[in-house]
Structure formats: C-alpha cells, structure tokens
C-alpha cells in the first residue's frame, strides 16, 4: 500500500487486486459431471470386486479434484474461505496421484509388489496432503516438484504394467503422466500465459490436467474391463 499527497490531503492507494482470467475454473467445473458419469460407468463395468473397489477410489479422488477445483476457482471467497479451499485444492493433487495409482497397482502387479507400493504411495500422499494443509503458503518451486516426483514414483514398475496390461496401457499411462508433468511445469513457471484476461497459464495447466485424466481413464478402463 502506498500514499500520495493531493490538495485535499494524503490519499491512500491500494495495490491492484489480480483479476482472474474469465475462463478460470470453467474447465474443471465443466469436467466434474462428466467425471461422475464416466466414473460410475467404470465402476459398474469393472470385471471384479477388486477392480470395482480400486476404480471407486480412483473415481472419488477425481471427483474431489475437479469438484473442489471448480468451486474454488469459479467463486469469490473471503480470506477464510479462500484459505480452506486453496488447501483442499492443492491437497487433492496428491490424492489424484495416489488414486490413479490404486487401480493400476492393485490390478497389474502381484500381491507381493502391489501391497508395499500402495503403502508407499498413500503414505507419500498423506505426507503431501499434510504439507499443503499446514503450509499453504509454500513456494511453487518447492511443492510443484513434489507433485511431479510422486507422479513418477512407480516408474520402475512400468515394465510390469506392460507385461500384465499390454503396450496400449503402458503408452496411456506414460502419455498421461507426461501431460500432468508438462502441466506442472507450466504451473510452476507461470508460462506460457497466452491471454491473462481470458485464458492464462493456469487455464493451460487445467487443460493439461483434464487431458491427462482422460488418457489415464482410458488406460484404467482397459485394465478394469479385462480382469
């Protein structure tokens, strides 16, 4: 805040409040009902009880991601509401990573491997959620790499994914991961920022998360339907 003198005395000048691009939040808000419908379809058509439970975890994490993001980014909130929703929005990124790993790990890996990996992934997600909840003001350069690193934590199991799920599943998992990663880099750098008034860097990031979810959804569907 600065002050300036005029003929009538000092005038307080406040710093301008950043204006959200007009498309902020619409992509995720619009995606939410589609995720609900697609998620129910995935759960119902899954070939086994194990697959249905694993897919339900994945679908729930996706609904939270897109639903909370849509509410947070479309609304105008006071300081307290802003802080709560921002914490939930950022924490849900760790949740969707673990949720995506759940059907892939439980349905493509043997029990001896899937159980330790599930503990590791969900333990990392719990730590990440606590990190974002209790340190919501952490710098982007710190927490963004955490998202990306956790997303690729099971890279050494990709050959196992291919052996059990096939080359199509492997390609879809990798492509989805790359889309999420590119989105994370754009979010961290705030570049490119094509149209700050309409469609900024955050909308590019949301577009890539949406595309990544669709790619992973197709891959997980292939896995769930062949159990």
Task: State where each predicted segment sits.
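Multi-pass alpha-helical transmembrane bundles in non-GPCR membrane proteins
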Residues: 1-227
């Amino acid at each position: 805040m600065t002050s300036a003198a005029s003929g009538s005395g000092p005038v307080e000048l406040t710093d301008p409040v950043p204006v959200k691009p007009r498309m902020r939040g619409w992509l995720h808000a619009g995606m939410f009902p589609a995720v609900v419908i697609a998620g129910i379809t995935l759960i119902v058509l899954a070939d086994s009880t194990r697959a249905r439970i694993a897919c339900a975890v994945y679908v729930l994490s996706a609904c939270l991601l897109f639903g909370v993001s849509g509410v947070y980014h479309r609304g105008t909130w006071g300081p307290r509401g802003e802080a709560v929703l921002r914490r939930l929005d950022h924490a849900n990124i760790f949740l969707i990573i673990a949720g995506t790993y759940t059907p892939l790990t439980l349905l493509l890996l043997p029990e001896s491997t899937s159980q330790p990996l599930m503990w590791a992934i969900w333990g990392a997600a719990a730590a990440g959620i606590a990190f974002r909840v209790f340190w919501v003001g952490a710098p982007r350069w710190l927490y963004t790499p955490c998202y990306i690193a956790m997303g690729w934590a099971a890279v050494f199991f990709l050959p196992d994914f291919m052996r059990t799920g096939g080359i199509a599943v492997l390609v879809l998992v990798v492509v989805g991961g790359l889309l999420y990663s590119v989105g994370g880099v754009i979010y961290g750098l705030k570049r490119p920022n094509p149209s700050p008034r309409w469609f900024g860097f955050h909308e590019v990031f949301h577009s890539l998360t949406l595309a990544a979810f669709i790619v992973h959804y197709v891959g997980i569907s292939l896995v769930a339907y062949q159990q």
